[in-house]
Amino acid sequence: MVDISIVIVNYKSWNDLKDCLQSIITINSSKFTLETIVVDNQSNDGRLEEFKTLFPSILFLENSGNNGFANGCNLGASNAKGNYLFFLNPDTIINKDAVLKLWKTTYKNPDYGIVSCLQTDESNNKYTEIRFFPKLSTLFGLSRVLYRFLNYFSLRKKFNFHKEKVFPDWVTGATIFMSREWFNTVNGWTEKYWLYFEDVDLCKKTQEKNGKICLIRTANIFHKHGGATRINIKTKALTKTEVLISKHVFVSEHKSGFNKHLIQSLLILSLLFEKCLLAITGIVFFFIPKLKVNIYIFKNLINYYRNAISKKTWISPRSVKYLQK
C-alpha cells in the first residue's frame, strides 16, 4: 500500500506541469512512499504521449473530456492506491519538507478532515489565509469589508501570526491533503462544479461531518496562480464567468428556504449591475484587453441566466452533472 497519492488535474498546462512533476520525482524519503497520478482533461494537443515517455514512473490518465477539476480529481482518486490523497495544481512546485509536514499533521490529527499549507507566488507574496464560506455577510464585496471590520479583533486572534496552525473556513484546491477515510466520508468532490468553488464545497462538506480545515504555516509550496485559465481573452472570460456560476451552485447546494432565494436574487442583481457597467467600460476602452474581457463576461452571464431559467438548474452546462437527475 502506498502512503500518499498525489493527484494532479491538467488541461494544456504542460510547461507548468513539467516543472511540478520534476519537483515531485526529486523527492526521496524513507519516511513515506509516493505515487503520482495525472489526469489530463482531454487537452487534445498531442502532448500526453510525450509526457508519458518523459515521466515513465507517473500514471497518466486521459479523461473523457474537459470535465472540470472536480471530476478529474475524483477520477484520479478512484485510481489511487494511497491511504492519503494529495490534490495538487499543475502550476505548483513542491518539496519533501512540505509533503512530510502535511502527512504528519493529517496522520496525527484524525479530526483534521483537510490540511493545507502556505503558498507563495513568483514575487514571494503569500496567498490569503483568511477565507469565509459564502453567506449574506461575506458573499459581496462591501458586505465582506464590513464583516472583516466588525470582526477585526476575533479574526486577528484566530489568525494570529504567531500560530503555526490556523483554521479558516476553507482552503484553496491548489493544495489539499486528506486521508482516504475522510475523502470517502464526504463522497469526494462534488462534480456539479465545472471550475471553482469545488474546494469551498469540499471544505463545507467536511465541516458538516465535524472535520476541521487546517492550514499549517510551517510548510510552504510555490504556486503560479492562473496557469491553465488565462490563455487568452475569451478563455479568461470563460473562467471568470464560471467563478460566478459556481457561486450560484454553492448557494443552491448549501442554502435552503427563504435565505437561499434571497441570496440567489441578490447575487443575480449585483452581478448583472456590476458586469453591465464593466462591459460598457470595456466597449469604450476596447483597446485595453483587461477591460475588453468584461464584454465577454457579461454576454456569458446573460446566456447563463437565460439557460438557468429555461432548464431550471443553476449548474453550468459544462458540468458532467448538467441536467442529470
Q: Which ranges hold each PLM region?
A:
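A conserved acidic beta->alpha catalytic loop
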Residues: 23, 40-48, 65
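Glycine-rich, basic loop-to-helix element that forms the pyrophosphate-binding segment
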Residues: 62-80
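Short aromatic/hydrophobic "clamp" motif used to bind/position activated sugar donors
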Residues: 85
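Conserved donor NDP-sugar-binding/catalytic core segment of glycosyltransferases
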Residues: 96-130
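Short, flexible, basic/aromatic active-site loop/helix in glycosyltransferases
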Residues: 135-168
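A short, conserved alpha-helix in the catalytic core of glycosyltransferases
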Residues: 163, 169-220
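Active-site-adjacent helix/loop segment of glycosyltransferases
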Residues: 208, 212-289, 293
